[in-house]
């Protein structure tokens, strides 16, 4: 559907037992007698291919069967029954033979204790492996993945499985409930090899069990290998954050990026929501006494909300009942089953009851039988699977047209906006995501009418398949009975199956479009947050305006407010105000002006460009840039802004925020709610819950990967670090204010509310500037003489005691020696400090050389000599962990990976729309990226659009060729003008290259 590339799915064996559950045909039986009488008939289906059994070994005449320990003794001629004890149960459940005993599912009291009987083939004197429908819960007490209770940090909690990949037989099982070393598939993967999870890790046991395996379904929907999905589920179950997983558990997720990991997380939450909804619906139907075994099976098979709605709709409270239910209540289900099983013995005349409504005439009886058959067909699993597969191969299109409503009810402007979709038709496999969102918006505004069109060939082939295969009577049926069956098929398709398919198609298209829109918003937000900062400059922020003037704010290189003012540039006082601006720039030695892109931006830009061209600010070489002021006005009146800038007018706060967005974009933009930054598409039409979760996750990812200096960062920035929240950030700031700066990372354990898990998640993303600490330590040495030199904090420096505090849970009190650790300024996690020290010893380096050129030279020469894999094996760690250690030791103390991103585009002159000509080549900055094109600011007051068809991989550098096609807000591009529509202020551009 989307033109964007998808990951290739690796073929694996089925995780779920091949258990074709019985069809939905027995739903809502009229009585127990009817069920018993007609239970022998089932729709025709292909007989499953039985597993080949090895011939039983012939026992010797004089030899008794060998009795194994803890196994029942088996006499000659009897079949072996495998006995398996369920967890937390004192009763053993016997597995029945696959060929002889197939029937009923045990009655379930509660969904959480429901277990499906396992089946195995009979074989004398041997215990066969049993198929598992659901993932078993591990019997041993699972401890946390990271060993939170340990006082000393462990180097790593995951190891690469270095053994030979074993090729499993086709009939082997694939489960995640037992030893990962035995059960995880081991195929050749392009990015990595399967990595075993620690034996003490939590299993993938789900709270609500279904008739499908969570790992397998998650793998199918995300196109990610099952062993990776199993590891991801365990990681999320252990409350690990995405930034922590991406950086420190990369080997467990096969090098997935943050977007892919976030997609898996969202899909997992959706599946769990469906399972919980199924559970609650089952409990509700049970209370009403309407539950049957077939209905329970059908509901446990549901994987989407649409499937659950289709199955449970007739059983909702207050429902009048379906036509099929009313026919069953009249006792016609036996006739419907007889038509399929024994049509020669069926006499519909015997069902006539003149005094009963619905049975008074032969026609009423035929209609009742037709409704029952239609319901059976529409709820049969194999039938629905066939029609879904058939639709995937045939032409199914979505159509939209202008709604037939009076012009008074619809705004004419809205009608013009949807001109492209008033006579629109497209195959559902080819339609773009933004088109789906546009059609949905038009439908919500009652401008468009939307329908899904399934070709007639689908219906014809479906009916032919039903008559000849699935629903074919078992013996000769008279013409009048075949007519009823034909009518039932047509009625089932038109009244039940077709609407269900339409709902499923629309829901799937909308869900995919919303997810892609949210992901695009997240990519744009990440690109904007990671804009390269412009440190070390004094900046003037300008919030443009007409009547109320332009608000000015001058900030220092450390973001301190130096001066604020208001000038009126567009009220005939421009020349007089120019002198004031020049005086301010000269007094504060400021040569950079930052203009917000709001009201009067174009006029303000022209004003400064004219003064710069006249060299009015000499001797200063003044330049200016335009930045987005989205969200600045909302932030200026927020409690955070009032706390940060008390007593300052909200309008002037906006000017301060605009200037700081250039000096440190990340630190300023995190103060604003992400959805107000305005770099998305149809953001008000998508799920707000999904949007907020995704954007908050992107902010956490960006802040964590950039890192924060814990001794100078703000509370707002700190709360977005992985593992922290508003309360923990507040406690950290309070501890810092009370006890002074943090000397090392170990002191974080002394902060209230920061437990072992929170410390594990946040420690690697928190930096402690060593220059700042050395200055502080030297001052402390002069006064107390407690700190001497620089030492490494190790487990020996930490004393751990358990102190009980009244009735509260005992909390570990950590007494940390106040010794700086140069590794605390790096991205190396404390759990890997021991490995880092051993690596330093191997290369002959010291902690004093961290981040210096000498360290880089030693590392490079050692790597050339030994190689990464050999070094990792010697240090008993993974290649990914070793790479993090190498990066941390070699990167300079002031390293900021945002410097690789584009900086704001500083200008000295302005160009008008009328000055453009077709073919003109310009440089511009990406303003927003959508699913249909890229908006680029080329400095003419109106953004131009690069259609998505003009953004090809050939025009991108190798580093830019990623899923988002490498274009996001802030990136500089070279474009060519293709078309200019001055009346509509539209500019069409072609991408030449990314600068």
UniProtKB/Swiss-Prot annotation:
GO MF term set: mRNA binding; structural constituent of ribosome
UniProt keywords, alphabetically: Coiled coil, Isopeptide bond, Phosphoprotein, RNA-binding, Ubl conjugation
Ubl conjugation keyword on record: yes
InterPro entries in alphabetical order: HHH_9, NA-bd_OB-fold, Ribos_protein_bS1-like, RNaseH-like_sf, RuvA_2-like, S1_domain, S1_Tex, Tex-like_central_region
Cross-link (Glycyl lysine isopeptide (Lys-Gly) (interchain with G-Cter in SUMO1)): 185
Positions of transmembrane segments: none
SS bond partners: none
Signal peptide: none
Example of a GO biological process term: translation
Crosslink site: Glycyl lysine isopeptide (Lys-Gly) (interchain with G-Cter in SUMO2): 84, 134, 166-167, 183, 185, 955
Alphabetical list of SMART domains matching this protein: S1 (SM00316), YqgFc (SM00732)
Domain S1 motif: 919-992
Organism of origin: Homo sapiens
Residue positions where Phosphoserine is found in the record: 861, 964
Coiled-coil annotated residue ranges, if any: 258-288
Compositionally biased spans, kind Low complexity: 146-159
Protein name: S1 RNA-binding domain-containing protein 1
Lineage, broadest ranks: Eukaryota, Metazoa, Chordata, Craniata, Vertebrata
Region Disordered, annotated ranges: 23-81, 120-165
């Amino acid at each position: 559907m989307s033109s964007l590339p998808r990951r290739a799915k690796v073929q694996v064996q089925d995780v779920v037992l091949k258990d074709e559950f019985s069809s939905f045909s027995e739903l809502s039986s009229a009585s127990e007698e009817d069920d018993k009488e007609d239970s022998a008939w089932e729709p025709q289906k292909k007989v499953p291919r039985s597993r080949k059994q090895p011939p039983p070994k012939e026992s010797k005449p004089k030899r008794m069967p060998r009795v194994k320990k803890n196994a029942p003794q088996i006499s000659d001629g009897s079949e072996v029954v495998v006995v398996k004890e369920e967890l937390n149960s004192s009763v053993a459940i016997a597995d029945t033979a696959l060929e002889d005993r197939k029937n009923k599912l045990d009655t379930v009291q509660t969904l959480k204790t429901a277990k499906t009987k396992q089946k195995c083939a009979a074989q004398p004197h041997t215990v066969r492996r049993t198929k598992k429908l659901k993932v078993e819960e591990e019997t041993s007490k699972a401890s946390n993945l990271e060993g939170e209770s340990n006082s000393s940090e462990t180097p790593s909690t995951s190891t690469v499985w270095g053994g030979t990949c074993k090729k499993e037989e086709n009939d082997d099982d694939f489960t995640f409930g037992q030893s990962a070393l035995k059960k995880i598939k081991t195929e050749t993967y392009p990015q990595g090899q399967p990595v075993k999870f620690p034996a003490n890790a939590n299993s993938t046991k789900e709270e609500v069990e279904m008739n499908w395996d969570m790992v397998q379904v998650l793998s199918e929907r995300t196109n990610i290998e099952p062993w990776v999905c199993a590891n991801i589920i365990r990681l999320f179950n252990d409350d690990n954050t995405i930034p922590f997983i991406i950086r420190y558990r990369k080997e467990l997720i096969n090098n997935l990026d943050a977007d892919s990991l976030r997609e898996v997380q969202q899909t997992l939450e959706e599946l769990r929501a469906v399972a919980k909804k199924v559970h609650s619906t089952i409990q509700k139907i049970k209370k009403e006494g309407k539950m049957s075994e077939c209905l329970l099976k059908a509901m446990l098979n549901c994987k989407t909300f649409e499937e659950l709605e289709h199955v449970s709709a007739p059983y909702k409270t207050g429902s009048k009942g379906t036509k099929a239910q009313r026919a069953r209540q009249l006792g016609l289900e036996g006739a419907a089953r007889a038509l399929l099983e024994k049509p020669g013995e069926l006499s519909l005349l015997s069902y006539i009851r003149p005094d009963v409504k619905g049975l008074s005439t032969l026609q009423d009886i035929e209609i009742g039988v037709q409704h029952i058959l239609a319901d059976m067909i529409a709820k049969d699993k194999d039938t629905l699977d066939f029609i879904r597969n058939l639709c995937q191969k045939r032409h199914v299109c979505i159509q939209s047209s202008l709604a037939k409503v009076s012009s008074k009810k619809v705004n004419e402007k809205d009608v013009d906006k949807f001109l492209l979709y008033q006579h629109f038709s497209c195959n559902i496999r080819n339609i773009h995501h933004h088109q789906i969102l546009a059609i949905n918006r038009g439908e919500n505004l009652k401008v468009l009418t939307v329908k899904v069109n399934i070709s007639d060939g689908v219906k014809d082939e479906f009916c032919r398949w039903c008559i000849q295969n699935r629903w074919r009577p078992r013996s000769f049926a008279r013409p009048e009975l075949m007519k009823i069956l034909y009518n039932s098929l047509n009625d089932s398709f038109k009244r039940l199956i077709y609407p269900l398919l339409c709902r499923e198609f629309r829901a799937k298209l909308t869900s995919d479009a919303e997810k892609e829109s949210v992901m695009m918003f997240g990519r744009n937000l990440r690109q904007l947050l990671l804009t390269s900062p412009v440190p070390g400059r004094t900046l003037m922020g300008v919030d443009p305006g007409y009547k109320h003037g332009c608000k000015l704010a001058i900030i220092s290189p450390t973001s301190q407010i130096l001066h604020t003012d208001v000038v009126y540039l567009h009220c005939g006082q421009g020349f007089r105000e120019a002198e004031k601006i020049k005086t301010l720039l000269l007094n504060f030695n400021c040569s950079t002006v930052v203009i917000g892109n709001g009201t009067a931006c174009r006029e303000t830009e022209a004003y400064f460009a004219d003064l710069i061209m006249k060299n009015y600010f000499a001797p200063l070489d003044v330049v200016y840039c335009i930045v987005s002021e989205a969200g600045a006005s909302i932030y200026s009146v927020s409690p955070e802004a009032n706390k940060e800038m008390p007593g300052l007018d909200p309008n002037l706060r906006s000017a301060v925020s605009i200037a700081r967005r250039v000096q440190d974009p990340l630190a300023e933009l995190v103060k604003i709610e992400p959805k107000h930054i305005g770099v998305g598409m149809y953001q008000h039409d998508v799920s707000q819950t999904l949007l907020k979760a995704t954007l908050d996750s992107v902010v956490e990812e960006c802040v964590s990967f950039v890192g924060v200096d814990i001794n100078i960062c703000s509370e707002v920035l700190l709360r977005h670090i992985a593992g922290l929240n508003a309360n923990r950030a507040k406690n950290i700031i309070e501890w810092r204010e009370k006890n002074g700066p943090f000397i090392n990372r170990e002191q974080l354990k002394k902060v209230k509310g920061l437990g072992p898990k929170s410390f594990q998640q946040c420690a690697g993303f928190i930096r402690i500037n060593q220059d700042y600490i050395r200055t502080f330590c030297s001052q402390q040495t002069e006064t107390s003489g407690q700190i001497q030199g620089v030492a490494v904090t190790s487990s020996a420096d930490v004393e751990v005691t358990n102190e009980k505090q009244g009735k509260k849970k005992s909390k570990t009190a950590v007494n940390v020696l106040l010794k700086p650790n140069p590794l605390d300024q790096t991205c190396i996690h404390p759990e890997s400090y021991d490995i880092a020290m051993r690596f330093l010893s191997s290369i002959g380096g010291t902690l004093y050389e961290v981040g210096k050129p000498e360290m880089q030279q030693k590392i490079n020469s050692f790597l050339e000599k030994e190689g990464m894999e050999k070094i990792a094996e010697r240090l008993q760690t993974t290649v990914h962990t070793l790479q993090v250690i190498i990066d941390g030791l070699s990167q300079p103390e002031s390293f900021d990976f945002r410097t690789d991103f584009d900086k704001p585009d500083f200008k000295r002159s302005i160009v008008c729309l009328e000055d453009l000509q077709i073919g003109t080549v310009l440089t511009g900055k990406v303003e927003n990226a959508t699913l249909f094109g890229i908006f680029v600011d080329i400095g003419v007051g109106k953004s131009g659009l690069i259609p998505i068809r003009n953004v090809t991989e050939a025009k991108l550098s190798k580093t830019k060729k990623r899923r988002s096609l490498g274009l996001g807000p802030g990136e500089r591009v070279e474009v060519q003008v293709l078309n200019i529509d001055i009346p509509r202020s539209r500019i069409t551009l072609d991408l030449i290259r990314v600068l």
